[in-house]
From Swiss-Prot:
Species in which this protein is naturally found: Haemophilus influenzae (strain ATCC 51907 / DSM 11121 / KW20 / Rd)
Taxonomic classification: Bacteria, Pseudomonadati, Pseudomonadota, Gammaproteobacteria, Pasteurellales
Protein name: ATP-binding protein Uup
Single GO MF descriptor: ribosome binding
UniProt main location, coarse: cytoplasm
Ranges for domain ABC transporter: 1-253, 320-546
């Protein structure tokens, strides 16, 4: 039985309805990806499923006591309190208890007293009774993986960080159905991969919207296409959907062509005059009227954007040269002793976590900031086009047309003059929309407009900082084709793994503490090389560690004889942690054994790169987690023994 059933759904805000008597059924334990062009109504459909928007007609039914959680595309900006409280509200029945526990814990850390400790113990007992620790641990895990400080005030968050907090809130409540609108937006690759694994373990149904094709391929068990008001279900994976959809559109185009040809013939016949109005032909006249109405009601497929680059003369052979470049800010090293030569025609992707220094790297190359040490030399004859992730190159008060042509009627691309309205239609801006102020545009429309403006500028060095945000898949794929054929030098900052893999020939991976390493190939090739490099390094470190163990043990014995036990005491939190660590260690060891067996299989490396890469990374992460957990267990055990010995 379906968890949610939408039947005969109809909703319209304009001439063309978003839902035109559509149907959708969400079954238990499935992961549905909702696809469609920008503006098709995908986000509105999620709001309908969540019960936040009512349809004009139709019915939606839910299984009894069904719990639905939704991540909004644009989280509310007027939320109050700190991140922990906001996320805990997603749990519902335990919200107040979890908030109280967090607040008292913070008070205890800042100002210890027996009274506060007593309050904490009372709340802990209530949480224990209500099985609340599971949710408290989940909240802390999600916040950690998304890089969120639980005590940060929501009012201090930018839109991207607020969206992360909203994602955390949607994930923690154990719903039956999880609705996610662009969950990978503003997440770096590491966070996206964690989210994928988190959702794969989720015991419920998921309906999500995403333009991240790698994410869709990994997650979706079914594709539902919202196309011109209709919901069409495609069982199976994303690639099967693409093939089937292409064939369906081909058949539809052929049928429309035949219909239009027959309609044209009937129109010629009706104009022949009196013969058409004889009684014996009244049926044919009525049929023609039906055909006219059918053609009037038909909604044609939306066109795709038409992109082309205005390339300039070639740059010099060497575009940039960096020699032992370091950069520090506020005591943090973003780049350390990095050297490279970027040549004409190179297509390089900068990959790393949020805040690691990718945009800083570009600013260093462009001379907008100076390195702390080292030298950067620019090549000759450079003409640069820069796609800024903050969209600062757009004037929100000006119209779409004026942003591109600055009040002129004509633009020039590759030596050919065109009317600005015709050019903007290539980017899916009809004349009426071209006269709209930029501040009224959606995120996807702003991205298309920035591309339209950027591609007008003659260039031989193209820098794209997060170009894929809010672009629909069709426009993304067209952009990829153009960049593949681009003869200049390309620098990309993106968290879209498929986009990087399809456009870059080399990846610079930020690996922490200012270390930046270069790998040949697209994203998945680079990650495979990185995994192999760190795996071999881990083996070397283990070998060194084994050699030094006898010396460490001898030193430890001497230290034990001479050192005096310190006065220490385990806190309640530490006692709980110590009790839980043995089970965690056992689980991690089991997980490592399973992963090692999978990797040892001869067929392992015959799988797709993203699968092998994920397994290798999971093994490295789990081994690191085991080591950290074991060291923590040793630390707490030693602390406990010192206390007992003193007593």
């Amino acid at each position: 039985m379906a968890l949610i059933s939408l039947t005969n759904g109809y909703l319209s805000f304009s001439d063309a309805p978003l839902l035109d008597h559509a149907e959708l059924h969400i079954e238990p334990n499935e992961c549905v990806c909702l696809v469609g062009r920008n503006g098709a109504g995908k986000s509105t459909l999620l709001k309908i499923i969540a019960g936040d928007v009512l349809m004009d007609d139709g019915k939606i039914q839910y299984e009894k006591d069904l719990v639905v959680s939704r991540l909004e595309q644009d989280p509310p900006r007027n939320a109050q309190g700190n991140i922990f409280d906001y996320v805990a509200e997603g749990v519902g029945h335990l919200t107040d208890l979890l908030k109280e526990y967090h607040q008292i814990s913070v008070q205890l850390e800042e100002n210890y007293s027996d009274q506060i400790l007593s309050q904490l113990e009372q709340v802990q007992a209530k949480l224990e009774h209500a099985d609340g620790w599971r949710f408290e641990n989940k909240i802390n895990e999600v916040l950690l993986k998304l890089g969120l400080n639980p005590n940060t005030k929501l009012s201090a968050l930018s839109g991207g960080w607020l969206r992360k907090a909203a994602l955390a809130r949607a994930l923690v409540c154990d719903p039956d159905v999880l609705l996610l609108d662009e969950p990978t937006n503003h997440l770096d690759v590491e966070a996206i991969e964690w989210l994928e694994n988190f959702l794969l373990d989720f015991q419920g149904s998921i309906v999500f919207i995403s333009h991240d094709r790698s994410f869709i391929r990994k997650m979706a068990t079914r594709i539902v296409d919202l196309d011109r008001g209709q919901l069409v279900s495609y069982p199976g994976n994303y690639d099967l959907y693409l093939t089937t959809k292409e064939e369906n559109l081909r058949v539809e185009a052929l049928q429309n062509e035949l219909f239009d040809k027959r309609l044209a013939q009937e129109e010629v016949w009706i104009r022949q005059g009196i013969k058409a109005r004889r009684t014996r032909n009244e049926g044919r006249v009525r049929a023609l009227k039906v055909m006219r109405e059918e053609r009037r009601q038909r909604r044609d497929v939306m066109g795709t954007a038409k992109l082309q680059l205005d390339t300039s003369s070639r740059s010099g052979k060497i575009v940039f040269e960096m020699e032992d470049v370091s950069y520090e800010i506020a005591g943090k090293t973003l780049l350390k002793d990095f050297s490279t030569t970027i040549l004409r025609g190179d297509k390089i992707a900068l990959v790393g976590p949020n805040g690691c220094g990718k945009t800083t790297f570009i600013k260093l190359l462009l001379g907008e900031i100076q390195p702390t040490s080292g030298k950067i030399r620019c090549g000759t004859k450079l003409e640069i086009a820069y796609f800024d992730q903050y969209r600062a190159d757009l004037d929100p008060e000006k119209t779409v047309m004026d942003n591109v042509a600055d009040g002129k009627q004509d633009i020039e691309i590759n030596g050919v003059k065109r009317h600005v309205l015709g050019y903007l239609q290539d980017f899916l801006f009809p004349p009426k929309r071209a006269m709209t102020p930029v501040k009224a545009l959606s995120g996807g429309e702003r991205n298309r407009l920035l591309l339209a403006k950027l591609l007008l500028k003659p260039n031989n060095l193209l820098i794209l900082d997060e170009p894929t945000n809010d672009l629909d898949v069709e426009t993304l794929e067209l952009l990829e084709e153009i960049l593949t054929d681009y003869q200049g030098t390309l620098l990309i900052v993106s968290h879209d793994r498929q986009f990087i893999d399809n456009t870059a020939t080399e990846c610079y991976l930020f690996e922490g503490k200012g270390h930046l390493n270069k790998y040949v190939g697209g994203f998945f090739d680079a990650k495979q090389q990185q995994a192999n490099f760190w795996a071999s390094k881990a083996v070397e470190e283990q070998a060194k560690a084994k050699k030094s163990e006898p010396l460490k043990e001898e030193s430890a014995v001497k230290n034990d004889r001479t050192s005096k036990p310190k006065s220490v005491k385990l806190s309640y939190k530490e006692q709980r942690e110590l009790e839980q660590l043995p089970q965690l260690l056992e689980e991690l060891e089991t997980k490592i054994t399973v992963l090692q067996a999978e990797i040892a299989d001869p067929a392992f490396f015959q799988q797709a790169h993203d699968i092998t890469d994920a397994k290798l990374k999971a093994l490295a992460d789990t081994e690191a987690e085991l080591e950290t957990a074991f060291l923590r267990w040793e630390e707490l055990e030693e602390k406990k023994n010192l206390v007992e010995g003193k007593a």
